[in-house]
C-alpha cells in the first residue's frame, strides 16, 4: 500500500494558515486558529468514515437516515502541541476515545524516544487519527506510529497542519500504510530542522513558551 498525502487547499484553510504563519499573531489567536484549522482538516480526514441508514421519525415523517457506523474512532495527540488539535476535533466526534504519546529526543543518538504512552485499551478496534501540528523530519511521527502499531492499532491516519517534504518521505519509507492529511507541504527544512517558510515552533506559539 502506498502512502497518500491529502493537501487541503480550501480557501478558509489557507487563510487561517497564513494568519498562523504571521509572526505578529499572538498566543491567544494562534491557539484559536490552530483549533479551527484542526476542525477543517478533520472534515477532510474523516471523509471516508462509513455510514449506514438508521430508521427513525422526524417531526414530519419516519425515514432512513445516514449515521456513522463501522469502526469506532480514537484521537491520539503527540505531546504537547498535538493536544490543541485533539481538543478541537473531539468536539466533532465526542464519542471518540483520546490517547496521548509523549516524545523526547535522545541527546546522544538524537533518536525520538517515547517517555509516555496512554492509549485506549481497544485501540486495535478503532480508526486512529494521530495529531501533531508539524511534520518536520518525521522522526517523532514515525516513533509515535510505531508505538501505536505495537499497541495493536491497524488503521492510522496522520493529521498535521504543516509538513516538510523530508518528513513526508520519512513516513512514506517507514510506514507506507499511513496516510497524511495536511494544510501545506512547505519547501524544505533549514539547518536547524525548522520547516521553511513554516510558522516557527508550534508548541511554543500555542502555549506562549520558548
Swiss-Prot record:
Cofactor: binding details: Binds 1 Mg(2+) ion per subunit. The magnesium is bound as Mg-PRPP.
GO molecular function per UniProt: GTP binding; magnesium ion binding; uracil phosphoribosyltransferase activity
InterPro entries named in the record: PRibTrfase_dom, PRTase-like, Upp_B, UPRTase/APRTase, Ura_phspho_trans
Residues that, per the record, bind 5-phospho-alpha-D-ribose 1-diphosphate: 80, 105, 132-140, 201
Cofactor(s) for this UniProt protein: Mg(2+)
Keywords from the named record: Allosteric enzyme, Glycosyltransferase, GTP-binding, Magnesium, Nucleotide-binding, Transferase
PANTHER family: ADENINE PHOSPHORIBOSYLTRANSFERASE, URACIL PHOSPHORIBOSYLTRANSFERASE, CHLOROPLASTIC
Family to which the UniProt record says this protein belongs: Belongs to the UPRTase family.
The protein's name: Uracil phosphoribosyltransferase
Lineage: Bacteria, Thermotogati, Deinococcota, Deinococci, Deinococcales
Amino acid at each position: 500500500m502506498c502512502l497518500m498525502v491529502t493537501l487541503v487547499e480550501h480557501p478558509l484553510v489557507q487563510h487561517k494558515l497564513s494568519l498562523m504563519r504571521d509572526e505578529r499573531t499572538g498566543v491567544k489567536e494562534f491557539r484559536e486558529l490552530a483549533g479551527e484549522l484542526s476542525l477543517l482538516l478533520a472534515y477532510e480526514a474523516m471523509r471516508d468514515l462509513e455510514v449506514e441508514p438508521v430508521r427513525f421519525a422526524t417531526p414530519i415523517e419516519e425515514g432512513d437516515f445516514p449515521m456513522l457506523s463501522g469502526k469506532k474512532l480514537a484521537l491520539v495527540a503527540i505531546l504537547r502541541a498535538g493536544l490543541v488539535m485533539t481538543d478541537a476535533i473531539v468536539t466533532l466526534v465526542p464519542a471518540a476515545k483520546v490517547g496521548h504519546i509523549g516524545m523526547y529526543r535522545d541527546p546522544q543518538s538524537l533518536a525520538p524516544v517515547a517517555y509516555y504512552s496512554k492509549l485506549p485499551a481497544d485501540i486495535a478496534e478503532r480508526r486512529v487519527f494521530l495529531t501533531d501540528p508539524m511534520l518536520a523530519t518525521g522522526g517523532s511521527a514515525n516513533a509515535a506510529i510505531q508505538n501505536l502499531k505495537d499497541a495493536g492499532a491497524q488503521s492510522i491516519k496522520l493529521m498535521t497542519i504543516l509538513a516538510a517534504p523530508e518528513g513526508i518521505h520519512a513516513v512514506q519509507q517507514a510506514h507506507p500504510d499511513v496516510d497524511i492529511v495536511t494544510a501545506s507541504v512547505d519547501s524544505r527544512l533549514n539547518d536547524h530542522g525548522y520547516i521553511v517558510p513554516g510558522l516557527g515552533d508550534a508548541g511554543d506559539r500555542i502555549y506562549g513558551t520558548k
